[in-house]
């Protein structure tokens, strides 16, 4: 397991162009649900991974907001619809996403089946039921510019050009965290605008 907080990166020109385009899109998207879906899909695209889950931090817990697995054609919550039968994740040290949120740290695990630091009984149970195989994992806490926790992005099973599952390259960690921070600012701004509109309506 690697827990990282800072590292220099040297993206290729193509990757840099993609990142800049994503940044522009993040700054112009005004629909909250579309923005959240774009965060998840951008993270998957940049890291070339098969699956991802986006959690939002509300009421002291991490709530499932969006889940997507390409190889199984699974897409839930993308249009803002609630994800049923998925209880909130409590903030405990043994849960990898909760740990990342509590300590505001990036967590990069090459193979969850070799890791004993965190409790992966949930993913292992899912694998046993569905035939999926969770292997590599990258967890990024999402904070706004006031260091408020907005949520957590969990990316699963990075793949090489042949489709083989590989560990997540460390160079993507800061890229994803930076995009997450920008997205968090936009989410906070949208929340502020909605609150102002609500207050204005209360005076009418």
What is the predicted role of each segment?
Residues 105, 110-136, 158-167:
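Signal-transducing coupling segments at domain and membrane junctions
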Residues 1-34, 45, 65-66, 189-204:
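Signal-transmission linkers at sensory-effector interfaces
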Residues 3, 133, 148-150, 156-179:
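Regulatory loop-to-helix N-cap segments in sensory/regulatory domains
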Residues 1-6, 102-106, 174-196:
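Signal-transmission/dimerization alpha-helices at domain junctions
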Residues 23-30, 39-48, 54-56, 101, ...:
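Short regulatory alpha-helical segment in sensory/regulatory domains of signaling proteins that mediates
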Residues 135-144, 151:
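A short, aliphatic-rich beta-strand micro-motif
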Residues 28-32, 36, 93, 169-172:
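The cytosolic transmitter module of two-component sensor histidine kinases
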Residues 41, 53-92, 105-107, 114-115, ...:
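GAF sensory/regulatory domain recognition
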